[in-house]
UniProtKB/Swiss-Prot annotation:
Phylogenetic placement of the source organism: Eukaryota, Metazoa, Ecdysozoa, Arthropoda, Chelicerata
Tissue: Expressed by the venom gland.
Residues of the LCN-type CS-alpha/beta domain: 2-66
Protein name: Toxin Tma2
Subcellular location: Secreted
GO molecular function: sodium channel inhibitor activity; toxin activity
Length: 69
């Protein structure tokens, strides 16, 4: 298991944006939907962060987000 920023797909490499003020469990639900233990909205990056993701779940790499893939 790993703790990291989930991405939509490994090819696109785009994180899930969130709003710390209006999160309402969005990131926690998103992470649990990907079989993680829990998740939250990391305010400094305005992105969802997951704890306990399966090792094969796609997570952010050093490459840029490419929404056109």
């Amino acid at each position: 298991k790993k703790d990291d920023y989930p991405v939509d797909t490994a090819e696109r490499n785009c994180k899930f944006e969130c709003n710390i003020v209006d999160d309402k469990g969005y990131c926690d639900n998103l992470c649990k939907g990907r079989k993680a233990e829990k998740g939250y909205c990391y305010s400094l990056k305005a992105s969802c962060y997951c704890y306990g993701l399966p090792d094969d779940s796609p997570t952010k790499t050093s490459k840029r987000c490419n929404p056109n893939v």
